Curated annotation (Swiss-Prot):
S-adenosyl-L-methionine binds at residues 91, 116, 143, 165. Keywords: Methyltransferase, S-adenosyl-L-methionine, Transferase, tRNA processing. It comes from Bifidobacterium longum subsp. infantis (strain ATCC 15697 / DSM 20088 / JCM 1222 / NCTC 11817 / S12). Its EC number is 2.1.1.33. It comes from the Bacteria. NCBIfam families: tRNA (guanosine(46)-N7)-methyltransferase TrmB. Substrate binds at residues 169, 201, 262-265. One of its GO terms (molecular function) is tRNA (guanine(46)-N7)-methyltransferase activity. This is tRNA (guanine-N(7)-)-methyltransferase. The active site is at residue 165. The keyword Ion transport does not apply.
């Protein structure tokens, strides 16, 4: 990949080693997920038992999804947990782990951190990584916004957020992972010229991404594809109304070549949904 919107994983910039003090966690957090049952079938339980000790990053606060007090994700932690100082790519919402494990297998020179809150997804990611004997991937079962609040500047080369929970009800849009505050924390966490890659198959979420990111200081949209989107949001079950709304052109990216076609994405395509890809590069704040 040689075009700017498909920055090659192989050539990610070197990261800084600055440390920042972890801010106090708010008493009332807006979560981007709903805690569901963590029951595992026998196969996934065996995977957890066999591979958690190898791949699961011990940064959670007990059985909670909070980040343990005093934890800072920085280059020192990367070197300790991965055993090297290679560039780090963080995937938010790993799901079943298909994409991040495939990326880790294809790029042994890069470290990968998979963030997932649901037990079955964590276990399946452990299973895929363990079966291949990968050494460059770790998994953390924590709330991603909290982790990025305690991530030191320049720690990550890239951040990936593929097919996040769309939270279709308008009253729940504040729970969407793409928010100004999250963008600010990711901007700080990225190395110079690092990128945040986002993908969604929900048109209303694509509009949300543009509203949050396109005018935000410190970010450059590297896209080259023009798409037409409605200028108003629709609520859950009202997606058909979007066709009659005023539309405008927006700039998005070609499909990221480093993202494998997961079962989730296949289902979206089979349902006739359009995939929206975004590549935002962190640039100097004005």
């Amino acid at each position: 990949m040689t075009d700017p919107e498909s920055t090659a994983i192989d050539s990610v910039a070197a990261m800084a080693t600055d440390h920042t003090e972890a801010p106090a966690h708010p008493l009332h957090k807006v979560l981007s997920f709903v805690r569901r049952s963590g029951r595992l079938d026998d196969r996934l339980q065996r995977a957890w038992d066999n591979y958690a000790g190898t791949y699961l990053l011990d940064i959670a606060a007990g059985n909670l999804l909070d980040v343990r007090e005093g934890v800072t994700l920085d280059r020192a932690l990367v070197e300790s947990a991965w055993g090297n100082d290679n560039p780090l790519i963080v995937e938010i919402g790993t799901g079943q782990g298909e994409n991040v494990v495939a990326a880790a297998a294809a790029h042994p020179e890069t470290n990968f951190l998979a963030l997932e809150v649901y037990d079955p997804g964590v276990a399946h990611t452990l299973l895929l990584a363990g079966k291949q004997g990968l050494t460059n991937i770790r998994v953390a079962q924590v709330n991603a916004p909290e982790l990025f609040k305690v991530t030191a500047p320049g720690t990550a080369a890239e951040v990936w957020t593929f097919f996040p929970d769309p939270w279709p009800k308008k009253k729940h849009h504040k729970r969407r992972i793409v928010q100004e505050a999250m963008a600010g924390d990711i901007h700080r966490a990225l190395a110079a010229d690092g990128v945040w890659r986002i993908a969604t198959d929900i048109e209303d979420y694509a509009l949300h991404v543009h509203e949050v990111m396109d005018g935000l200081d410190g970010w450059k949209n590297l896209g080259s594809v023009t798409v037409s989107l409605p200028l108003e949001h629709v609520g859950k079950g009202n997606a058909d109304l979007a066709a009659d709304m005023p539309h405008a052109d927006f700039t998005e990216s070609e499909r990221f070549e480093g993202r494998v076609l997961t079962n989730f994405e296949k289902k979206g395509l089979a349902a006739g949904r359009v995939i929206h890809d975004f590549t935002y590069q962190a640039v100097a704040l004005h």
